[in-house]
Regions:
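N-terminal leader/targeting and pre-domain segments
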Residues: 1-29, 104-113
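Short pre-active-site segment immediately N-terminal to redox-active cysteine/selenocysteine motifs
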Residues: 26-27, 34-37, 77
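The canonical Cys-X-X-Cys-His
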Residues: 38-41, 81
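Typically the conserved alpha-helix immediately C-terminal to a functionally engaged Cys/Sec
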Residues: 40-53
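Conserved acidic residues
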Residues: 62-64
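A short glycine-leucine-enriched loop at secondary-structure breakpoints
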Residues: 71-76
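Non-catalytic, surface beta->alpha helical segment in thiol-disulfide oxidoreductase systems
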Residues: 77, 82-113
């Protein structure tokens, strides 16, 4: 998973800031909020998440490296997942169950072409 390092990157995803010239933003992104010390986060199968639903752009936000974005998004616990679809935040889920997260993402994902 690519790291979501700054609030600027998040604001580009939700259309509050313009991306760099030539950068095409993904239509459907899931942001995974985590921390190195989070034992519940380690129980997730990140490979299964990334491969489980086609067409999903996955980003990881370490709350100790980027503490502004989780607060801005209302993240209260980790692991938490946030869906951004067509520049809108459309869902949030706090869970350390890989299958539950996959089912939630699959239900929200647009059909793949």
């Amino acid at each position: 998973m690519k790291l979501l390092i700054s609030q600027v990157e998040f604001e580009q995803l939700i259309g509050r800031q313009e991306p760099e010239p030539g950068v095409v933003l993904p239509q459907f992104t899931v942001i995974y909020f985590t921390a190195a010390w989070c034992s519940a986060c380690r129980s997730l199968d990140l490979d299964a998440l990334e491969k489980g639903v086609p067409g999903v752009n996955w980003l990881k936000c370490d709350i100790d490296q980027n503490d502004y974005t989780p607060g801005y998004c209302g993240v209260r616990s980790i692991p938490t997942f946030l869906i951004v679809h067509d520049k809108k935040v459309v869902g949030m889920l706090s869970s350390n169950k890989t299958q539950k997260v996959l089912e939630w993402v699959a239900a929200a994902a647009p059909p793949t072409k």
